Amino acid sequence: MKDKAYDITIIGGGPIGLFAAFYAGLRGVTVKIIESLSELGGQPAILYPEKMIYDIPAYPSLTGVELTENLIKQLSRFEDRTTICLKEEVLTFDKVKGGFSIRTNKAEHFSKAIIIACGNGAFAPRTLGLESEENFADHNLFYNVHQLDQFAGQKVVICGGGDSAVDWALALEDIAESVTVVHRRDAFRAHEHSVELLKASTVNLLTPYVPKALKGIGNLAEKLVIQKVKEDEVLELELDSLIVSFGFSTSNKNLKNWNLDYKRSSITVSPLFQTSQEGVFAIGDAAAYNGKVDLIATGFGEAPTAVNQAINYIYPDRDNRVVHSTSLID
């Protein structure tokens, strides 16, 4: 079945992509967001959800999660004209009659214009690399934590030895029934003070061990099998939830297949954020131009220009004068 034709497809559901989608809704066009991860929000939501951000206009400070929640709430005003596709990675797109055919790892989409807001490329969590892992993912196996309360009264196992793993273990100590940290080395990579707190806590530390297998029923993991490094000792850990904190990897390999002009790992754009292909625009960290400052605030400023230019491209005969939001929303 041929996909519905959208006015603008935004590649990337991070802060810049979300704001671009909102502004496109404000301008009355239909929008599709294609995001490679299983949730919206990009790096602030995934990599530093609880850390404070201080350079967002009108907010003295807010966390990555709060920023994401606000952007999603803002976009919800136009949910009737916005479609969101998660866990889809754009492989290629080609010019066709009336717009572009966009091929992802799951489907083919059609759009009249494209705005690329994928940051430094698609990024994905580093996994355990175990059979059946994907089956448990997003059920009771997590690569990121947003709501600590969801683990209340549970037996939680955390794999990893960096700052996030240690911070989550400490935060869950008084919430979960038990917390166990599994790390492949005796030494942790986290901040020294945090490691000292961890060692003085009630968190159970198992080092040096590596995950070997997952056991469960249906979509729920029940046991993690671990083996001591360079030894035959094997343990089975009962669990209610498993948190894998191995970090995230980024990749822009597909970006290089999009037949655009590039500057290092970013896309070269004009002052109006037009790429080397007519009808395709790029904003945020994905865009490269002289004097570029890689800040979220910068991307927010780029988004309206790119959206307006995309609308001018799609509807050249329409009266495309920009109107302030105070005149558009009661």
Curated annotation (Swiss-Prot):
InterPro entries: FAD/NAD-bd_sf, FAD/NAD-binding_dom, Fd--NADP_Rdtase_type_2, Ferredoxin-NADP_redctase_2. It comes from the Bacteria. GO terms for molecular function: ferredoxin-NADP+ reductase activity; flavin adenine dinucleotide binding; NADP binding. FAD binds at E35, Q43, Y48, V90, F123, D285, T326. Its EC number is 1.18.1.2. Pfam families: Pyr_redox_2. Belongs to the ferredoxin--NADP reductase type 2 family. Homodimer. HAMAP family: FENR2. This is Ferredoxin--NADP reductase. It comes from Streptococcus pyogenes serotype M4 (strain MGAS10750).
